């Protein structure tokens, strides 16, 4: 599984349980710059497949299915494009579309905080780093009860209602972990998103079966990103869900996403 941005290598127990119930191991890798993973400045989205292949080799896993949540979405698509035959199926869960996607206003519909963040990314590394360092100071100590309000305009009413209890504690732990050693991972994720990803949507569709999951109550990655991906990844199965937000998909749909991956891979 590819976590979002900025999210450290922290597993949500109900997700791990859902995977285990289906005979799957839930594996989460820290992308370069997160946690104890060495930064890789200038990395592209496609570069994640080097690390995925190395980790799976070490674990003795010759084949896999993958899901990417939010900023993890592009990295799941990279696996479909760059590891055909080994990646048997891929899904995005509220995943971002390419920054230069034709016909897509990438920032439209995002919460103010995301707009400010990616405007800084476009302005350059120095401006982005300054912005992220300021934001990281709050994330470094955030607690579960603070998550819903701390995300500001990035949470819809649906997501705010979901950000409670065990799920909120998981989100807080993942945010704290993401900036424990600095903001290099977050910075390089953002810069990779607004740059060439290193593969095409045609390569994604040719590499493995793909499913696109998206809710219309998402202020982090708007509905338009999901509809664009569904229309431009050849053969993609579209699961465009009214009433779902960015966070709620992880609660309500994760089991169904895994079931879909297994069925698409011929393992269901």
Regions found by a protein language model. Give the residues of each.
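Active-site loop/turn elements of alpha/beta-hydrolase fold enzymes
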Residues: 31, 95, 241-243
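Conserved hydrolase catalytic core segment
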Residues: 63-106
